[in-house]
Amino acid sequence: MKIKRDIVNKFKEWKDAAKHKPILLKGARQIGKTWAMEEFGKECFDYTAKFDFDRQKELLSAFTVSKEPARIIKELSLYSPVPLVPGKTLLIFDEIQECEEALNSLKYFCEEAPEWHIIAAGSLLGVAVKRRRMTVPVGKVQVMRMYPITFKEYLRASDIQTFNYVEQIEEPEKLSLIILDKLKSEYRRYMVSGGMPEAAVSMLENQGMQAVDDILQGILDLYELDFAKYADPREIPRIHALWRSLPAQLAKENRKFIYKVVKKGARSRDYEDALLWLEDAGMIYRVNAVSKPGMPLSAYEEADIFKVYASDCGLLRRLADLPGSIVIDQTANYTEFKGAMAENAVLQSLLPSYGSVPYYWSSEGKAEIEFLLQREDEIIPVEVKAENCVSGRSIVVYNERYHPKNRIRFSFLNLQRNSGMLACPSPLTEWAMKWLDK
């Protein structure tokens, strides 16, 4: 089974643009970057030439002989089983972090040979660039970020009829219970598998919970091997400890990140580099608090107050050793962590369309708004509730203080719009902004 990835549409827009720079594709390990690039090549080009700088060390010589694109292409043609023809061949530079000269060459292709279509990607690209002090040709590449499979992509593969029904909704009106139940059922399954392609496909093909867990555990094991391969040896124990503390951080009623949860007596200065490493690797998202919801939100960021979420809800579930059956069947003792999973899944759905990590707001422990989104000239408060539990005063406190024009509450209750409040089922997170002004 194939799961269509929306980023391929962005690649198509890039190809059709009058002018284009080489793409530098960023994203965590195992999210399907190589597959998406190759799929795009199959759909839109006569030929696809992939050069893997991790497996083909001999490719380095093609970039050390000359910086001229024409000469580089001539050298690369010796390693390509397909013709290299501008406009007809997609060039994929995979694992580009293993060849700094190839990364630098993107500047020259941008300036001197824009007729070539090049997408470069790499595992842990952000980490490698920092550690090896590599230079990214700023302004000469178009940076794109790829994320794990979203629920929208998952639903399109699992139930195309329900997907098409949702796509056609123009006004935020109540859904039939049949549609709502279908969405909730598929969403719970998605929260179990997450958006790592192999795990999501395993779930869609009904290979069983154990198969999904084995795949996710394999990815977690690979991530921890990456610590040893790419991190400073002095930081490896801290990265391990911080990463493994994530479930405990999110299981707290107040999900604010606390260093002492990582290790007794831990201080921020001891773990900041480890936290940055995990961010650069695309494994976590740091959601900072703001002192007040003012414009721009970045001006009110509180750097030392933040929450940390996993890049994928399936990986978070497996890291926490939470059985998938509990997520699907909603066992009674599944309480605080249910809220953490709900928030993580909503954040995961918001990021691809919103484009940047949001902020959050808290008022002396008395009220908290999970996410704040900045859209043009307004700040939109976003509440996330687990399942049908929507009680709480946080949004009331926020409304009384700041009087937002629009607000969103994600839960498992039905879709409706009422006096500036968009109540949206969590499975429909990616459609919410479309309905906000209706």
Model regions and ranges:
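Interdomain motor-coupling "hinge/lid" segment immediately C-terminal to the ATP-binding subdomain
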Residues: 129-251
